[in-house]
Amino acid sequence: MQEVLERLQAQVGQELGVSKWWEITQERINAFAEATDDHQFIHVDPDLAAQTPFGGTIAHGFLTLSLSVPMATEIPLDVGNPLMGVNYGLDKVRFPAPVPVNSRIRLRLTLDEVSEVPGGMHMKQTVVTEIEGQEKPAMVAERLVRLYY
């Protein structure tokens, strides 16, 4: 593990990669609404949502946040062979721009910190969810991950 830790520490401050584009369909939004019991009209009622400044339905902020996990796994990161990785939490989560239905998003990941903890390592990563064709990101968060060996 020490070799992996040193290799990752050398990458601190670097962007590690970008995920593929993910389409945010109304079906995905509706499924998230069902799973979380969050049926606010701006997410699930296209007719009412069309009358808002958004001009249509938008993804839940927490859907965008939830998708950051599988998107991050698309970005190659050589962490050796941990027994498991766990979500340790988040810091400074913001949703600067809404994600309109049928738009595409992707994740950009930067490694901010790496440190040793008992049995493993702790990483702090900045994750930025971009919306295709827009400058303002959908989400910016500091993601905390623990790997145990």
State where each predicted segment sits.
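A solvent-exposed, acidic/Ser-Thr-rich amphipathic alpha-helical stretch
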Residues: 60-64, 68
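A generic structural signal for short beta-strands and their flanking turns/coil linkers
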Residues: 18-20, 28, 38, 82-91, ...
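Catalytic strand-loop segment that frames the active site of acyl-thioester-processing enzymes
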Residues: 1-59
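Hydrophobic beta-strand-centered segment that forms part of the acyl-chain substrate-binding groove
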Residues: 52-56, 69-108
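HotDog/MaoC-like acyl-thioester-processing domains
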Residues: 2-11, 99-149
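A generic structural signal for residues embedded in beta-strands
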Residues: 18, 66, 107-109
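Generic structural detector for well-ordered beta-strands
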Residues: 17, 21-23, 94, 144-146
